[in-house]
């Protein structure tokens, strides 16, 4: 009983910030200029101009890779982000054959979806799911397939449509990723995770193949700056922006209890702060006039949440910054319907946001509240909350104890949390990092998306020269009595590395 009371108190505290936003009026309004084929409106006949050709104005072809790196209805927002991005590119004239979409595709037809067969990315937005190609779904959404697609390697792709980025030297590439992350890693619904060291090598290989002119990458994830900090060369003709710096969270938005709140039948967040910022900017601006730098500055301002960085994050930029003056249409296309707009965005300012890592708990709690009476489903929902929080506490305590065993009881916590100075990569040896993660998970259970935040701890263990044998001994001592069957890497789909 005491444990259950603690769980309730934890979740209630988690929801307090979002709940405080209820009842407040937002200023401004959201006026999407994109219309889905199924949407009707007074100006439907006026929105008829045909999309611009993908190769117009500069001689090359536009390519795009869109990745939603999660699964499960509690992560609704990531697939909503990616579907929305697809609609923007498609309206901009980027051909479907040149857009590769990775998404698990378990949201639109999920039993919990109050509007079956549709996905929305804004409380007042229309369906963004219609027409999105199913290139790589379910078990095909993997790091290996993503790398193969980016490199244009058709023989290395497993399953899916087989579509790859078959780009030429004069072409432009846009990559957008949305999911959970941690220091040096990005999530994938099928393990292992995407590790920064591997990603940078793939980008270098793509550049060496002379198969593109310029590339722009947008990444939505916690600690997403750590994927590129100290690693991203400036001579690859690749410009990157990330939702957060190397040491902070990114944030979900349009969540239950926020303003603007999703329709009452939705029990999960509809979008992510950085992602909706760039997309709502793109669809309300003339991308033949707006530059890459213009969008970066606008998104940075909005994502900081009016500089309330306890509920916002620092948008960062990496790589080659010499072509920021290029117009966005080179990467995202140009929607002729936006040709005469004034480049002024009126957006509703969220009164609160939800930490990416806690958004799943918000969903679980809203699901519990939605169920009536004392049904078996409601009890099962409560047990899921209890199990999830208990495993989080286990991860917290076991990592802390391992640090004390390895570095001493006095120095352990500080040694694990130490962040390197700006400009340095997270870890010197990425293979070591992966080995330490596997050792930990073999004894202590899966890290899960919550435990991704401890990648810096494993990196510091490597950077301090701790041996695999010592890490194994510490992990056994920390977790020897823990029944990890529920959270075994085998149960969770494999190791994170």
Curated annotation (Swiss-Prot):
Its EC number is 3.4.22.34. CDD domains: legumain_C (cd21115). Glycans are attached at residues 153, 340. The active site is at 180, 222 (nucleophile). It catalyses: Hydrolysis of proteins and small molecule substrates at -Asn-|-Xaa- bonds. GO terms for cellular component: protein storage vacuole. The keyword Protease applies. InterPro entries: AE, Legum_prodom, Legumain_prodom_sf, Peptidase_C13. One of its GO terms (biological process) is vacuolar protein processing. Auto-catalytic activation. The record marks 269 as: Required for post-translational maturation and enzyme activity. Disruption phenotype: In PAK22, higher quantities of 57 kDa polypeptides and lower levels of 40 kDa acidic and 20 kDa basic glutelin subunits in seeds due to reduced vacuolar processing enzyme (VPE) activity and leading to non-crystalline lattice structure of protein storage vacuoles (PSVs). Seedlings growth retardation. One of its GO terms (molecular function) is nutrient reservoir activity. Its main location: other. Pfam families: Legum_prodom (PF20985), Peptidase_C13 (PF01650). Keywords: Disulfide bond, Glycoprotein, Hydrolase, Protease, Seed storage protein, Signal, Storage protein, Thiol protease, Vacuole. It comes from the Eukaryota. Expressed in developing seeds. Residues 1-23 form the signal peptide. It is found in: Protein storage vacuole. Disulfide bonds join 255-269, 432-462, 444-479. It is an enzyme of class 3 (hydrolase). Belongs to the peptidase C13 family. Asparagine-specific endopeptidase that may be involved in processing of proteins targeted to vacuoles. Cysteine protease required for post-translational proteolysis of seed storage proteins in the protein storage vacuole (PSV) of developing seeds, by processing of proglutelin precursor to mature glutelin subunits, thus contributing to the formation of protein crystalline structures in PSV. This is Vacuolar-processing enzyme beta-isozyme 1. It comes from Oryza sativa subsp. japonica. The gene is VPE1.
């Amino acid at each position: 009983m005491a444990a259950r009371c603690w769980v309730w108190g934890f979740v209630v505290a988690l929801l307090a910030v979002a709940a405080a936003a209820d009842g407040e009026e937002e200023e401004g309004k959201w006026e999407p200029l994109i219309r889905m084929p199924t949407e009707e409106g007074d100006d439907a006949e006026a929105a008829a101009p045909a999309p611009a050709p993908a190769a117009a104005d500069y001689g090359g072809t536009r390519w795009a890779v869109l990745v939603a790196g999660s699964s499960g209805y509690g992560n609704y927002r990531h697939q909503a982000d990616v579907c929305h991005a697809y609609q923007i590119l498609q309206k901009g004239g980027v051909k479907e054959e040149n857009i590769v979409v990775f998404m698990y595709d378990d949201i639109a037809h999920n039993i919990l979806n109050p509007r079956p067969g549709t996905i929305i990315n804004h409380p007042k937005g229309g369906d963004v799911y219609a027409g999105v190609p199913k290139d790589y779904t379910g078990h095909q959404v993997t790091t290996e397939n993503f790398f193969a697609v980016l490199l244009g390697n058709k023989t290395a792709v497993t399953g899916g449509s087989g579509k790859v980025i078959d780009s030429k030297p004069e072409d432009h590439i846009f990559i957008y990723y949305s999911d959970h992350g941690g220091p040096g890693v990005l999530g994938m619904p099928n393990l292992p995770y995407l590790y920064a060291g591997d990603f940078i090598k793939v980008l270098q290989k793509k550049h060496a193949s002379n198969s593109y002119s310029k590339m722009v990458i947008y990444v939505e994830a916690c600690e997403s700056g750590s994927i590129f900090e100290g690693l991203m060369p400036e001579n690859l003709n690749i410009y990157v922006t990330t939702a957060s710096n190397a040491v902070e969270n990114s944030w979900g938005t349009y969540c239950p209890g926020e303003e603007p709140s999703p329709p009452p039948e939705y029990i999960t967040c509809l979008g992510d702060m950085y992602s909706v910022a760039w997309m709502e900017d793109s669809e309300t601006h003339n991308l033949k006039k707006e530059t890459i730098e213009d969008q970066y500055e606008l998104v940075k301002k909005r994502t900081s949440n009016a500089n309330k960085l306890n509920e916002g994050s620092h948008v960062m930029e990496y790589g080659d910054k010499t072509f920021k003056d290029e117009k966005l249409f080179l990467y995202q296309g140009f929607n002729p319907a936006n040709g005469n707009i004034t480049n002024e965005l009126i957006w509703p300012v969220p009164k609160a946001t939800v930490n990416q890592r806690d958004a799943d708990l918000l969903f679980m709690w809203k699901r519990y509240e939605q169920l009536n009476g004392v049904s078996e489903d409601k009890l099962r929902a409560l047990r899921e909350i209890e199990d999830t929080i208990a495993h989080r506490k286990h991860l917290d305590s076991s990592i802390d104890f391992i640090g004390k065993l390895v570095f001493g009881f006095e120095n352990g916590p500080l040694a694990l949390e130490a962040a390197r100075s700006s400009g340095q990569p997270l870890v010197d040896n990425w293979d070591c990092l992966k080995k330490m993660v596997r050792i930990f998970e073999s004894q202590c259970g899966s890290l899960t998306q919550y435990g991704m935040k401890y990648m810096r701890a494993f990196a510091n263990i490597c950077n301090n020269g701790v041996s695999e044998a010592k890490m194994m001994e510490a992990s056994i001592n920390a977790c020897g009595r823990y029944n990890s069957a529920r959270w075994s890497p085998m149960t969770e789909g494999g190791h994170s590395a």
